[in-house]
């Protein structure tokens, strides 16, 4: 945790699922599941600027709600820390102590990707007294998100995932400072989205190119990060695990991440220390819905014409379940909270 965030409380404070598929599988990935994830060619190189030529991704950025432009609030613009802990944290204080809650209230976490995993991560962080949250997702709610994303309901289709989750956080944790931003994470937005530098990042991005860039950036900047891999095509939450990226089993996406990070000069030593949430359950092949069998696949997502993940671009769409994505999210959030509490764990 940075000294600035320890001193200043931001008092207003799917994941890569197997269902997110694309038409352009990675040349080095032979798994059907991994080929279904959104890969873009990622150029070799050891420094982030060298990635520029290989990231011709469409970027959609909307202004931060609190400031009306792409300018982040400074420490002196944030409300002062509370003098007393609110009784809404009574049961949590009894678990982690006054000092633990105060530390979490002074913490800043950025969540990238607000789908089936990221939405549950966000709510759990809010209910764990994290004082400042930056919520990043370029997408709007689709009707097909309802089965697994907290902010997705029939009445919210077409609305910003980030803005909807921010409303939910404020209802739970009124003193939290929440930055909802609708943007696609890539080389052109990386510096902005990580400024000011958060105390911790949770990666629930559903695009491999962006995912690799985020992990590389966090490693190089020394930002603690936990990454979530494939939460789709599974039914057994008891198979969810946390391990170092170098030690995962079964998961094909983790293999791709290891290889791409190594191409950037982040080899075994660099990858060690990147915890990932993954499943050891074998992938389930997707069933064919009756409506697909009758009339072929038809995308019903809003604003799909300018989406980097329009369904028409996907080779295969895997199934998802909320009890799996939520299990991934709880594992990631638990790790994050424990990491934020480490300096006070012995007290």
Predicted regions and their residues:
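E1/E1-like adenylate-forming module used to activate ubiquitin-like modifiers
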Residues: 2-3, 200-323, 327
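N-terminal charged helix/coil linker that caps or initiates catalytic domains
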Residues: 2-14, 20-110
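Hydrophobic/small residue at the entry helix of a nucleotide-binding pocket
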Residues: 117
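Conserved S-adenosyl-L-methionine
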Residues: 127-132
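Short amphipathic alpha-helix with an adjacent loop that forms part of the alpha/beta core around
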Residues: 188-196
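Conserved N-terminal Rossmann-fold NAD(P)-binding element of oxidoreductases
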Residues: 112-113, 136
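Internal hydrophobic alpha-helix adjacent to the cofactor/substrate pocket in enzyme cavities
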Residues: 263, 329-342
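Glycine-rich phosphate-binding loop and adjoining beta1-alpha1-beta2 segment
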Residues: 137-173
């Amino acid at each position: 945790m940075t000294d600035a965030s320890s001193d200043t409380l931001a008092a207003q404070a799917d994941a890569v699922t197997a269902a997110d598929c694309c038409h352009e599988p990675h040349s080095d990935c032979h798994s059907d599941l991994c080929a279904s994830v959104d890969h873009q060619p990622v150029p070799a190189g050891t420094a982030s600027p060298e990635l520029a030529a290989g990231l011709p991704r469409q970027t959609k950025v909307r202004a931060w709600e609190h400031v009306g432009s792409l300018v982040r609030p400074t420490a002196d613009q944030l409300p002062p820390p509370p003098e007393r802990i609110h009784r809404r944290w009574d049961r949590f204080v009894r678990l982690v102590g006054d000092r633990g809650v105060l530390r979490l209230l002074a913490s800043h976490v950025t969540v990238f990707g607000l789908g089936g995993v990221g939405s549950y991560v966000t709510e759990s962080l809010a209910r764990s007294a994290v004082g400042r949250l930056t919520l990043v997702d370029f997408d709007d709610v689709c009707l097909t998100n309802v089965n697994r994303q907290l902010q997705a309901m029939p009445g919210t289709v077409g609305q910003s995932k980030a803005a909807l989750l921010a409303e939910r956080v404020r209802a739970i944790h009124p003193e939290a400072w929440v930055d909802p931003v609708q943007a696609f994470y890539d080389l052109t937005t990386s510096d902005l989205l990580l400024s000011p530098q958060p105390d911790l990042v949770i990666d629930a991005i559903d695009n491999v190119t962006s995912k690799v860039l985020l992990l590389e950036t966090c490693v190089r900047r020394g930002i603690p990060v936990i990454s979530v891999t494939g939460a789709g095509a599974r039914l057994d939450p008891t198979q969810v695990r946390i391990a170092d990226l170098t030690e995962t089993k079964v998961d094909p996406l983790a293999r791709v991440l290891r290889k791409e990070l190594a191409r950037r000069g982040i080899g075994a030593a660099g990858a060690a220390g990147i915890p990932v949430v993954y499943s050891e359950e074998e992938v389930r092949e997707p069933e064919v819905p009756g409506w697909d069998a009758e009339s072929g696949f038809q995308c019903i997502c809003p604003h799909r014409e300018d989406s980097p993940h329009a369904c028409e671009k996907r080779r295969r769409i895997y199934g998802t379940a909320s009890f799996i994505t939520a299990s991934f999210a709880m594992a990631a959030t638990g790790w994050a909270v424990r990491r934020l509490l480490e300096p006070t764990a012995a007290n």
